[in-house]
A protein has these predicted regions:
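Flexible glycine-rich surface loops and low-complexity tracts that mediate binding to linear polymers
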Residues: 89-110
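Structural detector for short beta-strands of small beta-barrel domains
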Residues: 25-59
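Sequence contexts marking disulfide-bonded cysteines in secreted/extracellular proteins
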Residues: 20-22, 62-64
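A mature extracytoplasmic/lumenal domain signature
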Residues: 58-62, 82-84, 100-102
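Beta-strand/loop nucleic-acid-binding surfaces
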Residues: 65-88
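Sec-dependent N-terminal signal peptides
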Residues: 3-14
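Boundary at the C-terminal end of the N-terminal hydrophobic targeting segment
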Residues: 16-18
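OB-fold/S1-family single-stranded nucleic acid-binding modules
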Residues: 56-58, 103-123
C-alpha cells in the first residue's frame, strides 16, 4: 500500500513539473499567439459606464501557475500603455504574439477574466 501511494505521488509530482505553465518568474520567456480585441463592457458587473476593455484571445489553452493552482486559460484581459493605445489599429483583430512582462490573478470587479496582463509587448 505504501508503495502504491508513493508511485501515485511521484506520478502526480512529475506531471506538475512537465506541465509548461507560465509563472511570475518566467512569463517573458513564453510568448503567446492569439488575437487582441476591443470589447466594450460595463465598468462594474452589469452596471456603470461602458468602457473599452482589451482582451487577448489565445490560440490554445495556456497554463498559468498561480497561488491558487495551475489554470488553463483561453483569454486574458490586457492593460495597454499609452503608446500601444495610439497604435491600437495596428495590433487589434489580427494574429499577433504577446510577450507578457507582468501579470496578476484577476476576477475582481475591475478584471473580467481570471488572468490580468498588466504589461506586455505585441508583435
Amino acid at each position: 500500500m505504501k508503495l502504491l501511494f508513493l508511485l501515485f505521488f511521484l506520478s502526480i509530482s512529475s506531471y506538475a513539473h512537465t506541465k509548461d505553465c507560465i509563472n511570475y518568474e518566467d512569463s517573458e520567456s513564453n510568448p503567446i499567439s492569439g488575437e487582441l480585441k476591443v470589447i466594450p463592457t460595463h465598468m462594474f458587473y452589469g452596471h456603470g459606464d461602458i468602457i473599452d476593455n482589451y482582451f487577448f484571445f489565445l490560440d490554445k489553452n495556456t497554463c498559468f501557475s498561480t497561488e491558487y493552482g495551475d489554470w488553463d486559460i483561453k483569454q486574458v484581459q490586457v492593460i495597454l500603455s499609452e503608446e500601444q493605445l495610439k497604435k491600437i489599429d495596428q495590433i487589434t483583430y489580427k494574429k499577433i504574439t504577446m510577450e507578457i512582462e507582468d501579470w496578476m490573478v484577476g476576477e475582481t470587479q475591475s478584471w473580467k477574466t481570471r488572468i490580468g496582463i498588466l504589461k506586455a509587448k505585441f508583435r
